[in-house]
Amino acid sequence: MRLARSGAALVLACAGSAAVAVDVSQLDYGCERGAQVAAIYISDTDPALAILQIEGRQVVFQNVPSGSGARYAEDPAREIGYIWWTKGDEAFLTWHAEDGQETDLLRDCRITPTE
């Protein structure tokens, strides 16, 4: 996997409509316990999106307000499910349950250099 394709254009074509160019970048993270996470960021949308492969499925996150860094929520309206936080070259993943419990799933994630 490549570290970043900043400025790359992804062309989405829908039947019966014009193609749309979207700014897409991919960053690979190395986390605690040797976990690897590939995150795809789509910044031209409102809200911006992040897509991660978690527990065998693709999860789409929407950018939500944060005090510092970038915060992406799986279910931004209810603030439950997966939450992906990034700041600089660091990131972490948490789970927010309906009862308000918050569980850290991945900590100490850092962007990994390309080989």
Residue ranges with predicted function:
Residues 14-18:
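N-terminal signal peptide c-region/cleavage motif recognized by signal peptidases
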Residues 1-8:
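Bacterial N-terminal signal peptides that target proteins for export
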Residues 22-115:
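Cysteine-centric segments in proteins
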Residues 1, 21-22:
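Absolute protein N-terminus
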